Amino acid sequence: MEKSVLRKEMKRLRREMTAEERKIRDEKIFENLTTLSRFKDKKWFYIYVSYGTETDTKEIIKYLLSLKDKKDIHIAVPKVLGTEMEFFEIDSLDELKKSNMGILEPNNHRLVNVKDVEYFERLNPAENVVMILPGLAFDIERGRAGYGGGFYDKYLNRYGADDFLKIGICYDFQM
């Protein structure tokens, strides 16, 4: 199937879910992700802030933020800067504001990435970093169809896609 057709179909299927279906599916994704040992053991969490009909990540972010008092962990969320995307560390959802596109983005300047953060010099990114990726569709070969802007692809190419764990989250019909 052509990517543009696939994107349109996945958006349609997500829009057609009832609020109750979405809630049940989001809760299951939350449970599956937060109990995954490869997820729980990380120190840096790069995670998108859900928008519209995307798989909900706000509850995941709240959960991670609640762990900061108990564990040495860091949460970073993306912000689009022109044609690029960067991640900024947050300590609260209150640090987010709506962009021109209506997407919640960090309203601070604590830029982090897997190559520049001094903290990473003491860490092995493969052991300590996870990125939660959005997507409209995923395949069994770990391929991902995003929204077509290439922001995540460019970011991963710039900073080394093989350096850390990446987890795509979606509803079952998106695979």
Regions inferred by a protein language model and the residue ranges of each:
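N-terminal active-site beta-alpha-beta segment that forms phosphate/nucleotide-binding
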Residues: 1-123
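Conserved phosphate- and dinucleotide-binding cores of soluble alpha/beta proteins
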Residues: 86-175
